[in-house]
Amino acid sequence: MRSIVIAAGGTGGHISPGVALAEVLTDLKEKIGYENLYLYSLIRNQNNPDLEQAPCPVLWHNLPPLSSNIFLFPFRYTIQILKTFLLFKKLNVDVVIGMGGYSTVSSILYGILFKKKIYLCEQNTVPGNVSRLFFRFANKAAFSFPPKNSAIPCDYQVLGNPLRKKTLPKMSLKFSEKYDTKKKTQFNVLVMGGSQGARQINNIVIALMGHEEINIQFRFRVLTGSALYEEVSKKTKKDAELISYSDNMKEHYEWANFVIARAGSGVLSECAAFALPMILIPYPYAKDDHQMANARYLELNGAAIVIDQKDEDESHLFKVLDQIANNVNLLNDMSISSLQCSHVDASKDTVKYFFSLD
């Protein structure tokens, strides 16, 4: 019985699209000639909500990162790779789908050594180290955004970032369909820093809440990140709407008129699916500055305004919000552009591309 493995470790940005592909493959695996489907992730992700709700069995491994103990690393790394090889041979794994990150290395090496099909998903415009290393061995690769360097040494297509079924909108409402310009009510602003939260963004928005003119025009809902919730709640007013973590992002996207966020691929793809204008403050220390590259792509296409800063000075964001408050048409144009950048069928399209389905 042949099997498919989706290697999705690392952070939520790798896990969520992996689970999204699993949702589609669960329904199609027999049609494409495979009996079993598994997700393969790091043990530390056992409490990840997406993996807890996975539509297929999840297998666990403990591949160490390169930064672990330099003396024990070679031994631990080799042992874990061998364990992966033995497990995959036992399961008769014939296809490996890598979602990016160091945790996929053992799975991809299995595919190379035993000449199995290898498909890679790259979420960012600037591919990560693992993707760059293994593109040449891949049968196909799927990108969420157009790669900054188009010289990719394998067949690839830009298909969007796979999204979970529970996150997809029933209808993508543009800004003009959600905000009544005649009433001129407060703008609903969703603030989020990604799966881990972002202290910088939290502190910038807290400072903004100290400006009365901002509070009159904007209503903030801040997803602080679980680890930062207590810290933020101590700094803000009692009536501030703070949420530590949400497993139902759809309701927040439907509530929002626009978002203030980092520029991870998952967040950007979800916001685009909901036709949301974006104010992006990319994480300044991201590997290869990939968040800035993602953000600039959306800015170039009219869906986002990018703020490039490392400090917590709220004046930059204040100016942008003031610009928005006095130009509602800008938000409407950004909303239309955001929807044009979306790929709501990315999960299905990626599976069809990998397995050559009509």
Curated annotation (Swiss-Prot):
It is found in: Cell inner membrane. InterPro entries: GlcNAc_MurG, Glyco_trans_28_C, GlycoTrans_28_N. Signal peptide: none annotated. Cell wall formation. Catalyzes the transfer of a GlcNAc subunit on undecaprenyl-pyrophosphoryl-MurNAc-pentapeptide (lipid intermediate I) to form undecaprenyl-pyrophosphoryl-MurNAc-(pentapeptide)GlcNAc (lipid intermediate II). Transmembrane segments: none annotated. It is an enzyme of class 2 (transferase). Its main location: membrane. Belongs to the glycosyltransferase 28 family. MurG subfamily. UDP-N-acetyl-alpha-D-glucosamine binds at T11, G12, G13, N124, R164, S195, Q291. GO terms for biological process: carbohydrate metabolic process; cell division; cell wall organization; lipid glycosylation; peptidoglycan biosynthetic process; regulation of cell shape. Pathway: Cell wall biogenesis; peptidoglycan biosynthesis. Keywords: Cell cycle, Cell division, Cell inner membrane, Cell membrane, Cell shape, Cell wall biogenesis/degradation, Glycosyltransferase, Membrane, Peptidoglycan synthesis, Transferase. This is UDP-N-acetylglucosamine--N-acetylmuramyl-(pentapeptide) pyrophosphoryl-undecaprenol N-acetylglucosamine transferase. GO terms for molecular function: UDP-N-acetyl-D-glucosamine:N-acetylmuramoyl-L-alanyl-D-glutamyl-meso-2,6-diaminopimelyl-D-alanyl-D-alanine-diphosphoundecaprenol 4-beta-N-acetylglucosaminlytransferase activity; undecaprenyldiphospho-muramoylpentapeptide beta-N-acetylglucosaminyltransferase activity. The lineage of its organism: Bacteria, Pseudomonadati, Spirochaetota, Spirochaetia, Leptospirales. PANTHER family: GLYCOSYLTRANSFERASE, UDP-N-ACETYLGLUCOSAMINE--N-ACETYLMURAMYL-(PENTAPEPTIDE) PYROPHOSPHORYL-UNDECAPRENOL N-ACETYLGLUCOSAMINE TRANSFERASE 1. It catalyses: di-trans,octa-cis-undecaprenyl diphospho-N-acetyl-alpha-D-muramoyl-L-alanyl-D-glutamyl-meso-2,6-diaminopimeloyl-D-alanyl-D-alanine + UDP-N-acetyl-alpha-D-glucosamine = di-trans,octa-cis-undecaprenyl diphospho-[N-acetyl-alpha-D-glucosaminyl-(1->4)]-N-acetyl-alpha-D-muramoyl-L-alanyl-D-glutamyl-meso-2,6-diaminopimeloyl-D-alanyl-D-alanine + UDP + H(+). The gene is murG. It comes from the Bacteria. GO terms for cellular component: plasma membrane. It is a peripheral membrane protein. Its EC number is 2.4.1.227.
